[in-house]
Amino acid sequence: MSDTQHQVNVRVDTRYLPEQSAPEQNRFAFAYTVTIENRGEVSAQLLSRHWIITDGDGRTQEVRGAGVVGEQPLIAPGAQHTYTSGTVLATRVGSMRGSYQMLGSDGVAFDAAIPVFRLAVPGALH
């Protein structure tokens, strides 16, 4: 059975930040811009986030917290919310994935999956 009430799509674009990186110190900074689109039939508020960040050596870090960049946006049906944040890795490549914990205006809590996306210094991958 498909839940048409609660459908949230997440897209992510990334970029390497050379001006904030120090490769000689194994510090590689990345920005990511997330677009959260509410394709459901009810408004949905983003309450919290859960990230799983993995570097190129397989080291994993989990991050949990309220909202995103200090906000807990309420996203109407058909609307979207976009924000930019960042992370620092100790390797030239890595990945992130996770989920947002959402609350529909109908009182139903649900998770919106954040598909895995790659972080990579340009030219690091063939």
UniProtKB/Swiss-Prot annotation:
Q: Which Gene3D superfamilies match?
A: ApaG domain
Q: Which residue intervals define the domain ApaG in the entry?
A: 2-126
Q: Name one GO biological process term.
A: error-free translesion synthesis
Task: Give me the segments passing through the membrane.
Answer: none
InterPro entries linked: ApaG_domain, ApaG_sf, Uncharacterised_ApaG
Protein name (record):
Protein ApaG
Organism, by scientific name, is Pseudomonas paraeruginosa (strain DSM 24068 / PA7)
